[in-house]
From Swiss-Prot:
InterPro entries: AICAR_Tfase_dup_dom_sf (IPR024051), Cytidine_deaminase-like (IPR016193), MGS-like_dom (IPR011607), MGS-like_dom_sf (IPR036914), PurH-like (IPR002695)
Record gene name: purH
Protein name, per record: Bifunctional purine biosynthesis protein PurH
Keyword Hydrolase: yes
GO biological process terms, semicolon-separated: 'de novo' IMP biosynthetic process
SUPFAM superfamilies for the chain: Cytidine deaminase-like, Methylglyoxal synthase-like
Domain MGS-like residue range list: 1-145
EC number: 2.1.2.3, 3.5.4.10
Pathway where this protein functions: Purine metabolism; IMP biosynthesis via de novo pathway; 5-formamido-1-(5-phospho-D-ribosyl)imidazole-4-carboxamide from 5-amino-1-(5-phospho-D-ribosyl)imidazole-4-carboxamide (10-formyl THF route): step 1/1; Purine metabolism; IMP biosynthesis via de novo pathway; IMP from 5-formamido-1-(5-phospho-D-ribosyl)imidazole-4-carboxamide: step 1/1
Similarity-based family: Belongs to the PurH family.
Cellular component GO terms held in the UniProt record: cytosol
Keywords of the record: Hydrolase, Multifunctional enzyme, Purine biosynthesis, Transferase
SMART domains, A to Z: AICARFT_IMPCHas, MGS
CDD domains the record matches: IMPCH
Length: 511
C-alpha cells in the first residue's frame, strides 16, 4: 500500500519543493484549501480532503479534517490486529505523514487594529487536533510543523526509504511544544481581554532567540528566550549593529541599564556593572550627560555597560572610545559615531527603542518550586503626594538632585542608598543588610562630592543613624519613603543639621 501524506499549511515556505520530494518517493499527498490550490498551480497532483472524508468542507472551512477517516488513519496502531481490522472494515487508509502549521493567531493579534472577532477566527481547531493525533502515534506517523525540518525528512526518505524513529520522536516533541505555545498565546490573549489579573493557572511561552556560550559562570549552560509580545524597548528585541555575541551577563546588565535610562526624559546616560548603576548623568545633550556619568565613578565604569536615551553623536563616541566598555545601547548612532566605535571589534553596539514600561508589564521571578508574578515597579514620583516634615525645603538644585537620586535608587539592590550632586550620581551603596551600611559605602565612594549632595533611600530609616552619617558627610537633602515608627527621630536629626528631608510615601525595594 502506498504511503500517504496530509499537507495543510498556513506558512507556505518551501512546501512546493517538499511535496515534490514526497511525490518523487511515491507518497500520495492529500491536501486542503489554499495549500491544495498552490500545489496544483505548481503542477503537483494531490488528493482533495473531501475525497478522503466523503464529506465537503463546511462552515467556511471550520470543519474539514475533523473526521474518522482522517483521525482513524492517524491514530491507528499499525501492529494492533484489532485496529487494522477496524480500518479495513470501515475503509480507513493509514496516513503516514502530516505536514501542518497552524492558523496565524500570533500574527493576527499583533496587528494594531485587530478585532476580537478576527482573533477568534484565527484560532485553529482542526490543525492542532491533527498534529496532536499524529504526534501521539509518532511510532508510525511523521509529523512536521516547521519548514526547517523539511530537508531532514526528505534526506532520510531518500537514504532509508523511511524516517528514523529518533527523528519521529524529535518531531513529535516539537509538535507538543508547538501546540502548548499556541494554546498559551490564546489563553493569555483571552485572559487579558477579560481583565483577569491573577488567574488560577499561568501559562507562559517564550521563543528561543539564541544559545549562549555559558551562563553567569562558565560551568553553567544558558539560553536566551524572548517573549512573543515583549516591548520593542527591550534587550530581547534590540538590534546588534556590531561586536561580539552577547553573553548571559551582558544581557542582564543591558536590561538593568535600559530600565534605569527609561526613567529620564532629558538626555541621560547610565553606566551599569553587575546589574547596579555605577554612574548616571543628565545634561543639556548626550555628550554632557555621558561626561557626568563617567565622572560619577571613573573607576567602576571600566568594563561596564552604557545606555543612552538619545542618539550617540561623534563627540560622545570619541569619549566612549577612550575606555574599555562591553556594550553601548542607544536609540541610534550617527554614521560618524559608528565609524569611531566600530574600530573596536569586540564592542557591542545595540539600538533599541527607549520607552518606559507600563504597570501592565509583568515581572516573573523563578523561585525553587514556583514562580512569583508582580507588576513592574514603574511608579514615578508624585510631587502632589509628597510631604516635607523638616523646617527647611529643598532648593531648586537640591530638588533636581533629589529627583535624580530617587529615579535611580529604585533600580539598586536593597538596602539601597544613592547620592546625587550637580545632575549626576556620586555614590551608590547597594545590597547591604543594614541601611546605614549602604549609606557609608555611598558616602565613601562619593568622597568630597558628598558635600552638598542629595541622598535617596529606597525604604524608610528605622533609626536616625543614616541621617547622622549624611550630616557628617555634608549631605544637605534627603528623600525617603517615611513611615517608620521612629520618623520623628530622623526629622529632629535632620533639623538639627539643617538638612531638608522629603517623604514620598512610596517604598522601592529591589531584591
Amino acid at each position: 500500500m502506498k504511503k500517504r501524506a496530509l499537507v495543510s499549511v498556513s506558512d507556505k515556505t518551501g512546501v512546493v519543493e517538499f511535496v515534490k520530494g514526497l511525490l518523487e518517493q511515491g507518497i500520495e499527498v492529500i491536501s486542503t484549501g489554499g495549500t491544495k490550490k498552490l500545489l496544483e498551480e505548481n503542477g503537483l497532483q494531490v488528493i482533495g480532503i473531501s475525497e478522503v472524508t466523503g464529506f465537503p468542507e463546511i462552515m467556511d472551512g471550520r470543519v474539514k479534517t475533523l473526521h474518522p477517516n482522517i483521525h482513524g488513519g492517524l491514530l491507528a496502531v499499525r501492529d494492533n490486529e484489532m485496529h487494522v481490522a477496524q480500518m479495513n472494515e470501515l475503509g480507513i487508509q493509514p496516513i503516514d505523514f502530516v505536514v501542518v502549521n497552524l492558523y496565524p493567531f500570533k500574527e493576527t493579534i499583533a496587528k494594531p487594529d485587530v478585532t476580537f472577532a478576527d482573533a477568534i477566527e484565527n484560532i485553529d481547531i482542526g490543525g492542532p487536533t491533527m498534529i496532536r493525533s499524529a504526534a501521539k502515534n509518532h511510532k508510525f506517523v511523521s509529523v512536521i510543523v516547521d519548514p526547517v525540518d523539511y530537508d531532514v525528512v526528505l534526506a532520510e526518505l531518500k537514504e532509508n526509504g523511511e524516517v528514523t524513529e529518533e527523528t519521529k520522536r524529535k518531531l513529535a516533541a516539537k509538535v507538543f511544544r508547538h501546540t502548548a505555545a499556541y494554546d498559551a498565546l490564546i489563553s493569555n490573549y483571552l485572559t487579558k481581554q477579560m481583565g483577569e489579573e491573577s488567574p488560577e493557572t499561568v501559562t507562559v511561552t517564550f521563543e528561543k532567540k539564541q544559545d549562549l556560550r555559558y551562563g553567569e559562570n562558565p560551568h553553567q549552560k544558558a539560553t536566551f528566550y524572548k517573549a512573543p509580545f515583549a516591548a520593542t524597548s527591550s534587550v530581547a528585541y534590540a538590534e546588534q549593529l556590531h561586536g561580539k555575541e552577547l553573553s548571559y551577563n551582558n544581557i542582564n546588565d543591558a536590561d538593568a541599564a535600559l530600565s534605569i535610562v527609561k526613567e529620564f526624559t532629558e538626555p541621560a546616560v547610565v553606566a551599569v556593572k553587575h546589574m547596579n548603576p555605577c554612574g548616571v548623568g543628565v545634561g543639556a545633550d548626550i555628550h554632557e550627560a555621558y561626561t557626568r556619568a563617567y565622572e560619577a565613578d571613573p573607576v567602576s565604569i571600566f568594563g561596564g555597560i552604557i545606555a543612552a536615551n538619545r542618539e550617540i553623536d561623534k563627540a560622545t563616541a570619541e569619549k566612549l572610545h577612550e575606555i574599555f566598555l562591553e556594550i553601548v545601547i542607544a536609540p541610534s548612532f550617527s554614521q560618524e559615531a559608528l565609524e569611531v566605535l566600530q574600530s573596536k571589534k569586540n564592542l557591542r553596539l545595540l539600538t533599541v527603542n527607549i520607552e518606559k514600561a507600563t504597570s501592565a508589564s509583568k515581572k516573573l521571578t523563578s523561585v525553587q518550586g514556583g514562580l512569583l508574578v508582580q507588576e513592574e515597579d514603574t511608579l514615578s514620583l508624585d510631587e502632589d503626594a509628597i510631604s516635607i516634615p523638616t523646617k527647611r525645603e529643598p532648593s531648586e538644585q537640591e530638588w533636581k538632585d533629589l529627583k535624580l537620586a530617587w529615579k535611580v535608587v529604585k533600580h539598586v539592590k536593597s538596602n539601597a542608598i544613592v547620592l546625587a550632586n550637580d545632575n549626576m550620581t556620586v555614590g551608590v551603596g547597594a545590597g547591604q543588610m543594614n541601611r546605614v551600611g549602604s549609606a557609608k559605602i555611598a558616602i565613601t565612594q562619593a568622597g568630597e562630592k558628598a558635600q552638598g549632595s542629595a541622598l535617596a533611600s529606597d525604604a524608610f530609616f528605622p533609626m536616625p543613624d543614616t541621617v547622622e552619617e549624611a550630616a557628617k558627610a555634608g549631605i544637605t537633602a534627603i528623600i525617603q519613603p517615611g513611615g517608620s515608627i521612629r520618623d520623628e527621630d530622623s526629622i529632629k536629626m535632620a533639623d538639627a543639621y539643617g538638612i531638608t528631608m522629603v517623604f514620598t510615601g512610596v517604598r522601592h525595594f529591589k531584591h
